[in-house]
Amino acid sequence: MRSRCNAGAMGATGAIGAVTLSLLLVAPAYAQQPPSGDGSTPLHWAAYQDDLAKVDQLIRAGANVNAANDIGATPLWAASVNGSAPMVKRLLDAGAKPDAALLTGESPLMAAARAGKLAAVDALLAKGANPNAKGARGQTALMWAVAQAHAEVVKRLLLGGADVHARSDTWSQMMAVPPHGLPEYNRVIPQGADTALMFAARAGELTSAKMLVEAGANPSDHDAWGVSATALAAFAGHGEIARFLLEKGADPNNDTPGFTALHCAIMRRDEATVAALLAHGANPNAPVTMWTPTRRSSDDYYFMPALVDATPYWLAARFTQPGIMRLLAKHGADPKVIHESNYVQGEGYQRRKDRTTAVMAALGMGGGTAWVPIDRAGRDALILETVQVAVELGADVNATSIDGRTALDSARAQKYAAVAAFLESRGAVASR
């Protein structure tokens, strides 16, 4: 949805031939000549190039202001892509239809909103442009303005009647996690049904989110999959939006997609949002109930199969967040939780089962990959503090994994001398 001035929409090369437009404009008859092979006219190009003088000449010579090329692009759409208010106004005054859309449904208003040009948006609305027209996948001008952080345009669209409850189209898509070839790690996931508020949560657009909620958007909104705006904001690292939505009454416990906003905030190491979620009633013991997909060879954040059934407290221990562990315990999290995992890893489809406490998780046992990497210089001290908090809150230092290993075994194997010494001081015994 990024703003693009794409000359390809009106032909990849100079569709008017070898003679330049400036020379051809000398002859008024040029305005009436047939369009080029892709349907583009000289008026398209003059509008696209933001040449107001040439546009004036062409219009006076009788050029069709509503001519559309093969993809439905009109001169007004080209001007709107540029966000040129003077050009938009000139074409509208000459009779250009404000809602003439591309074949995909994208209207001039949508293009101007994406460009973030308030004056162009205002001119289109003043001429009756539909603020709720939908383009590809059912997206609206309001959604595009929000996604591009054009808050002033968002405000104008809302004043012009844009629907805060409008949703994008819904479809389903087969998605997977590694190893992608394993049938049980492939499933159909609903996509779309996003409102403008969901776009704000994803993009981190707090100013727009506030305007949308004030205009009636539901703080507990969710998409077709069931991901809430709060969870999406936390997932995307926009804790300030998640906290705002909570203050406005958002449900902190939506777990429809298999995870909650609390899980996302922990994975993002966002202690402020974790605190806000707990203060608003988030369940400190809600487990991750389903893996989430990722693209092949990507750096996407996702809940891998090894994390299914993990609780917030275990996640905080696994990813060395002692402050969050204390917060969770204060709000009722079970610090003696034992995570039982059962998953497949590697292209060899190796089945693995793990049984780990918070102490073991802090040492990397139990699987899973961090979303936010920790600076290597401070990692050892953070692991030690996490282990200390886990033991302080009641974790069994001599619990064993399914293959018989203890936390002390892991500490020694990884040469965490300070951690091993601490565990020994608390009665830990090696199994091997």
Residue ranges and their predicted role:
Residues T13-V26:
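Bacterial N-terminal signal peptides
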Residues Q32-I71:
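N-terminal segments that cap or nucleate solenoid repeat domains
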Residues S36, N69, L102, G135, ...:
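Ankyrin repeat boundary/linker residues
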Residues W45-D50, A78-S84, A111-K117, W144-H150, ...:
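Ankyrin repeat A-helix N-terminal signature
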Residues D51-I59, S84-L92, K117-L125, H150-L158, ...:
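Ankyrin repeat structural motif
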Residues D403-R432:
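Leucine-rich solenoid repeat scaffolds
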